[in-house]
Amino acid sequence: MQQGWLSNWLVKHEVVHRSLGFDHRGIETLQIKAEDWDSIAVILYVYGYNYLRSQCAYDVAPGGSLASVYHLTRIQYGIDNPEEVCIKVFAQKDNPRIPSVFWIWRSSDFQERESFDMVGISYDNHPRLKRILMPESWIGWPLRKDYITPNFYEIQDAH
């Protein structure tokens, strides 16, 4: 499998990762261990990836792991030719913990909160990690594949 510049750089500096190749738009995708995410995030920011385009999370498989996905952009040579990279950080479903990157990219605030709320990934050192879409009293994480839908929903006044 062909590796991009980031994967080659990480190999050169002995940072453990797994190259997942390139997507249909030619964007390099890497799998990173949760314990390495802090240092790799700093490396990417210093290199110029100062824009977090999006962050999302998904359930890989029932009983399997959860993934937090970060799409980062670096605009160096003009807006028409941005460099992008996709980082996937996996966590075990029994204790899904991933370091928050709020202190690097402030735009991750609501995105990490939504991932916590819908999938149940805890983002360590996030300053306001609480539910953002579901009521605080909600039990479970609705976007997990093993989620059991309640038999009833309490209708709440929006005011």
Curated annotation (Swiss-Prot):
Assigned EC number: 7.1.1.-
Enzyme class per UniProt: translocase
GO biological process, alphabetically ordered: photosynthesis, light reaction
Main location: plastid
Membrane topology: Peripheral membrane protein
Catalytic activity: a plastoquinone + NADH + (n+1) H(+)(in) = a plastoquinol + NAD(+) + n H(+)(out); a plastoquinone + NADPH + (n+1) H(+)(in) = a plastoquinol + NADP(+) + n H(+)(out)
Protein name: NAD(P)H-quinone oxidoreductase subunit J, chloroplastic
Gene name of this polypeptide: ndhJ
